[in-house]
Amino acid sequence: MSQDLNQDANSVAAWIASLLKQRGIDRIFGLQGGHIQPIWDCLGKQGTRIIDVRDEGAAVHMAHAHSELTGQLGVAMVTAGPGVTNCVTAMANAALARTPVLLIGGCTSRPQANMGPLQDIPHTEILAPICRYSRTARVAEQVIREFDEAIARAFGDLGEPGPVYIEIPTDVLRTSVKKTLIPKDWMIPKLIRKLYPDPELIEQAVHLIRQSKRPLVITGRGGKNARYELTRFLDTVDAVYLDTQESRGLIDRNNKAFVGAMRAAAMNGADLVITVGRKLDYQLGFGSPAVFPEAKFLRLADSTGELIDNRRGDVEVLANVKTSLNALSDVLNMNAGERDSN
């Protein structure tokens, strides 16, 4: 155990601060508290910008906004007990928005667990239903591995992106861990595993597109990183395009496919609806035949949550969205102008 944390470059708190810096985190939003003070000290020492708030929920909302605007991980840090519970609404919002947010919380020391210590609340159980990852990191030598896994989950490794939560007992934060016990690969970003589209499904999707006369493309959060691929696909398909709140600004409003008004008419008149990383929720009439009376559905997404909802797709492609859009454009461009007659 280190007696002077500020002099121990190998404390768990110092390792956490170093990891965040190596992952490109230049600012953290939060409200100071005793349970997390060791991390704050290390962050300040290394020059990370700390944005102080007056309510913990605001810290998570700000981290959420930062992630939305930059594409980076948003990080918030709060103390134990009410510090964490004040974040529940903001974390639920990040979960529904599928935004990468890391919330770091404090918790009581291991020797005092279940003895009635200050602000001892089951944070991980409270947050688990709305987080991709919710853990207490109790083993000092494994804390950085836990952070590595949590951040990968936040960015959608093996599932949807979304908020994650990690808490570290106060005694663990002050524990010194030798450099030889921290593998280098824990400190660098994981390569997010990519799903590739089934060629048979791509062929079926192309058949649907060639049959259609009035295709409509609707994007959501799952398509937000595919600007180039989506623009190319729209040019290839010659479809009408609708954005949603989740994908506003993805496509230039001057693009010939863009429809800013008469959106209801566009949905009502489509004979093929192509959803790109978009759930059929209340904003899209739940995919109801009353809204889309003549449409078949082609669903593209990299997570099941954006495929399995209120309307089954005639063709569903569960794969990386960029790769799927490029695959469709490639096949369609092989025989430009060809359409099945029906």
What kind of feature is each model-predicted range?
Residues 2-340:
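N-terminal alpha/beta PP-like core and its mobile active-site loop of ThDP/TPP-dependent enzymes
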